Regions:
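Alpha-helical tetratricopeptide repeat
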Residues: 1-11
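Inward-facing hydrophobic residues that define packing positions of alpha-helical scaffold repeats
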Residues: 8, 27-28, 34, 44, ...
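Alpha-helical linker/edge segments of TPR/alpha-solenoid repeat scaffolds
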Residues: 39, 46-64
Length: 64
């Protein structure tokens, strides 16, 4: 299993157990493994979605 697939797998497992912050970190780590920012963009979008889940669930407090 390559590094990108490894981080994506860990992100999926974290999401399944409701740990959206860890899922976002793993998607970010997967994105950073791509040779260009454009190639990593889909993983960054998934990381943003995971962070949005965390905010919605009150796991991350957003200042005003």
């Amino acid at each position: 299993m390559d590094t990108i697939a490894y981080h994506q797998k860990l992100a999926g497992l974290a999401h399944e157990r409701g740990d959206y912050v860890s899922a976002a970190r793993h998607y970010r780590d997967a994105a950073n493994c791509y040779p260009s920012a454009e190639q990593g963009e889909p993983c960054l979008k998934l990381a943003e979605q995971e962070l949005a889940h965390a905010v919605a669930k009150g796991m991350i407090l957003v200042g005003h």
